[in-house]
Amino acid sequence: MDLDVDQAQNVDDLKTLYERYAANSDYIFIDSAGYSPNDSVHIGKMRTVFNVKNMNESIYLTFAAGTGARDLENILRNYDVFGYKSVIVTKCDETTSFGQLISVLSQKDKKIAWITTGQDVLGTMQKATAAWFLKNLTEFKIDTDTIEKKYGIADKETGSLF
């Protein structure tokens, strides 16, 4: 992925950056710079900063794959004010237990759009696929032929479908 990284401190900065990139970009990712998901004051400020016309077309909530079920439910609830429909799951290489994550997201009707594997988030970001998760479940006996017939042929290196 060829990505530029910029920093916005306020709504004017964000508006300028959005206007710069919107016409020529498939995606614009915004990181909340590591604030606690329990910091309601910061979440309120973020809501104000993200108030840029046409910007909230697709908002993804991001969290680590190893996040526990109770914490994940809390994070999803606290950020619900942003109206996100899908999530980005990072650090998928740091766990082999995805059951709680998938269960909580299913209960909340949230889809996994993207995943990352490794410390180089931008370099390892890929579209999430059912095949990737099936291949990475602990103690799951995989029938690759059946999965590939149902979901498509996956790239052996990335797990992404062609």
Name the predicted role of every residue range.
Residues M55-F63, D80-L122:
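Conserved beta-strand/loop subsegment of P-loop NTPase cores
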Residues V11-D13, G34-P37, A65-A69, C92-T96, ...:
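Conserved nucleotide-binding/hydrolysis micro-motifs of P-loop NTPases
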